[in-house]
């Protein structure tokens, strides 16, 4: 199987691989399970000042990343490439675990890191960029968001986690937030590990974990239950049922 290949187009290539050079992702990169290359967008400017932005048409605050410059950068990285092209943008579709799994199942990804006020809409349309958001907030640039997307993808690539079962009960897998975790000591500051977790009854433990996952999801992310067709206010939905 070919290694997952990530290409990032950015004005700040020195920000990569960042934290992805450490821990699971870093070790996976050393083993050749995935690779990362960066493209300096400014290298594709044609004037002597290496200009990559200009004022917004129609007026307004900030600067806009130029279509011609960015298009040349994209073409250099992916002219005959079928990898998905993502543009990190606060107005994009929210990244979901489902989309992460889809991306991880492919050969790789091309990520464009926006800067300034935005990117010329024409290059978004002409180069088929998929606008992706990691949350309802604005960052100073797309680089931290790109690192977040790659982190989410790389950790679920086959063989990256020591135990491929590790991700099965994580938040958003199965449409629920993850259940609470505990470890030794048994008692800490007067707080005990729930007795069910040390009972040795694995069926009861799984049932408890599922019920806790449903409870936390109902409290913190009722939208996830609504998306799956469950009623956030009722415990009698299918999400609340679990065979021991």
UniProtKB/Swiss-Prot annotation:
Respond yes or no to whether keyword Lyase is given for this record: no
Which cellular compartments is it found in? Cytoplasm
Biological processes, Gene Ontology terms: tRNA N1-guanine methylation
InterPro entries this protein is in? Alpha/beta_knot_MTases, tRNA_m1G_MeTrfase_C_sf, tRNA_m1G_MeTrfase_TrmD, tRNA_m1G_MTases_N, tRNA_MeTrfase_TRMD/TRM10
Give residues annotated as binding S-adenosyl-L-methionine: 114, 134-139
Tell me which Gene3D superfamilies the record gives. Answer: 3.40.1280.10, tRNA(m1g37)methyltransferase, domain 2
Q: What class of enzyme is it?
A: transferase
- A single cellular component GO annotation: cytosol
Q: Which domain of life is it from?
A: Bacteria
Reactions that this protein is recorded to catalyse:
guanosine(37) in tRNA + S-adenosyl-L-methionine = N(1)-methylguanosine(37) in tRNA + S-adenosyl-L-homocysteine + H(+)
Read off the CDD domains from this record: TrmD-like
A GO molecular-function annotation: tRNA (guanine(37)-N1)-methyltransferase activity
Location, primary (coarse class): cytoplasm
Q: Where is this region: Disordered?
A: 220-244
What keywords were assigned to this record? Answer: Cytoplasm, Methyltransferase, S-adenosyl-L-methionine, Transferase, tRNA processing
**What is the E.C. number?**
2.1.1.228
Summarize the protein's role. Specifically methylates guanosine-37 in various tRNAs.
User: Its quaternary structure?
Assistant: Homodimer.
Q: Which family does it belong to?
A: Belongs to the RNA methyltransferase TrmD family.
The protein depicted here goes by the name tRNA (guanine-N(1)-)-methyltransferase
Q: Which gene encodes it?
A: trmD
